[in-house]
Amino acid sequence: MVRMDENMPFLLQYENVAWYENGKVRILDRRIYPTEVRFVECVTYQEVVQAIADMVTQSAGPYTAVGMGMALAAWQVRDKGAAEQDAFLQQAAYDLAHARPTTANRYGQITYRCAEVAKEALAAGKDPVEAIVENTVESLNRRYSTMQIVGDHLAELIPQGGTILTQCFGETIIGTVIRAARRQNKDFKVFCAETRPYLQGARLTSGCFAQMGFDTTVITDNMVAYAMEREGIDLFTSAADTIARDGHIANKIGTFQMAILAKYFGIPYYVTGIPDQDKHSKDDIVIEMRDPQQVLSYRGIPNTVPEVKAIYPSFDVVPPHLISGVVTDKGVYVPYLLDHYFDSDVKKFY
């Protein structure tokens, strides 16, 4: 099968995200990468659910993990009858989709399709595990291909020799904008906000750009205004975990304040991604609240005295008036007109 992860950084190659083989799913532990390259092995789909909830894989990594988790679920009930297998896979589809609430709708598009594929395979006398793995790779190929178009559009917006600022880890878009920039013979500098508390910007995004030859600088999250004022930032960009049809987007916590600063300094902010058809407004966006202990410590080392409390919303919502454009596979949309994305046929994405 043709794959779309060719010439991608290590982090974005399918097997280095999550992969099913011989009754196990192995997931790259992004919590410790790049200090260590270690994979978490899951022998039940329930362990995959827990790994996603525990942030073993982040950004778009769960899109791969949930599909491979469905293959593992099919393996778990390989000796059962068709009806029992189907019931088990329906439950697995729900559990995997809801491993993290903010993106449950996106994960569900993958998991429920995997359940359908397994049922079709059983009816045809084929191996449902193999069918699910093939379906997941096809889903990855669709997403990577679509995001390549998005990456092409984003690269066109970046000035030659310019400087961009990123937030968190945009996963596929990072790889596709790098490929697009190379094709366009375009070079630029990259500033990566570290993205507390998991440091995805420092650990994941910066490495992808640096390994592909871009001049890359990491800043702490509280240096954003300084960098925008003094380091010649031309463009701020992020992906989004949810893009509502009214132009509101949800992304990693801290994106909202960065968008405010970009507006203050007159720096365009471009969001990349595909709008969510079932998210009509910001009221449809669910913000995941995580264990505040993850803010009070880093890698098990406490940062505060025991009496101190914390909060940890995983995402915040950016209103459309702070967004210069939403970069999609159909071009760049003014956020207030984003609903028009659905005026014409929408390609299957997940």
Locate predicted features.
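Long amphipathic alpha-helical segments
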Residues: 8-124
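C-terminal binding/interaction regions
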Residues: 22, 94, 101-114, 121-165, ...
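Electropositive phosphate-/nucleotide-binding environments in soluble metabolic enzymes
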Residues: 42-49, 60-64, 83-86, 90, ...
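Ligand-binding beta-strand-loop-alpha-helix segment within the catalytic cores
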Residues: 109-160, 186-188, 192-236
